[in-house]
Amino acid sequence: MGYLTSSFVLFFLLCVTYTYAATIEVRNNCPYTVWAASTPIGGGRRLNRGQTWVINAPRGTKMARIWGRTGCNFNAAGRGTCQTGDCGGVLQCTGWGKPPNTLAEYALDQFSNLDFWDISLVDGFNIPMTFAPTKPSGGKCHAIHCTANINGECPRALKVPGGCNNPCTTFGGQQYCCTQGPCGPTELSKFFKKRCPDAYSYPQDDPTSTFTCPGGSTNYRVVFCPNGVADPNFPLEMPASTDEVAK
């Protein structure tokens, strides 16, 4: 009976392991606290400078996104607010964040057994970011970056506390939101694209902004402020925040 029990446990563990398509490591190199968020899996985690959060993403995960929240204040129950990236006033996100927020987006094991992933500024920008496979395999499976000083150079019409908002949220309409058919870049989307050519700058910016890696065998790393305190392109002021409760 003991042998059968051990065999069952081993089989169960192997099945659980097999269901994970990718491990995604989220690291905060910013000189301030970032409250990382991840949906539809993960929820949220407070990351002080230098801390890492590991997310195990199942096969078939899609429409997934990771972002950083700044200027947060949560109570012991995990309720509060964030200056940027807030997701309904909770630490454990179940929905998307409020713009502006720099996004790492991914879908695992999709068409032709490929992972599809990107950095998106369609919701605006709040924190510099790198998104990378841990073992690049050539082609479009390589690190991508958005580390420009977008907050410092943000057009006045898009500038908000803690970030640089997106034109759709700010102005609305088909020209910026692309909700009613094909659309092209605008002068405001070109502002983002010039500074972060790897990233989506408007909703239909697919050709230069979507990256792929082999599904089921690739792990990833998302880094906030990848250049840390030595980053000459990013202002080092601390985002507004009050007392926080770590979870």
Swiss-Prot record:
Residues 1-21 form the signal peptide. It comes from Solanum lycopersicum (Tomato). It is found in: Cytoplasm; Vacuole. GO terms for biological process: antifungal innate immune response; defense response; killing of cells of another organism; response to salt stress; response to virus. The gene is NP24-I. The keyword Signal applies. Disulfide bonds join 30-225, 72-82, 87-93, 141-213, 146-196, 154-164, 168-177, 178-183. Induction: By salt stress or by viroids (at protein level). GO terms for molecular function: beta-glucanase activity. Gene3D superfamilies: Thaumatin (2.60.110.10). Has antifungal activity against P.betae and F.dahliae. May be involved in disease resistance in tomatoes and/or have a possible role in fruit development and ripening. Binds to beta-glucans and exhibits beta-1,3-D-glucanase activity. GO terms for cellular component: cytoplasm; vacuole. Its EC number is 3.2.1.6. Keywords: Allergen, Antimicrobial, Cytoplasm, Disulfide bond, Fungicide, Glycosidase, Hydrolase, Pathogenesis-related protein, Plant defense, Signal, Stress response, Vacuole. InterPro entries: Osmotin/thaumatin-like_sf, Thaumatin, Thaumatin_CS. This is Osmotin-like protein NP24-I. Belongs to the thaumatin family. It comes from the Eukaryota. It is an enzyme of class 3 (hydrolase). PROSITE patterns: THAUMATIN_1, THAUMATIN_2. Changing residue 24 to F: In strain: cv. Rutgers and NP24 II. Highest levels of both isoforms found in the outer pericarp, with smaller amounts in the inner pericarp. It holds the Pfam family Thaumatin.
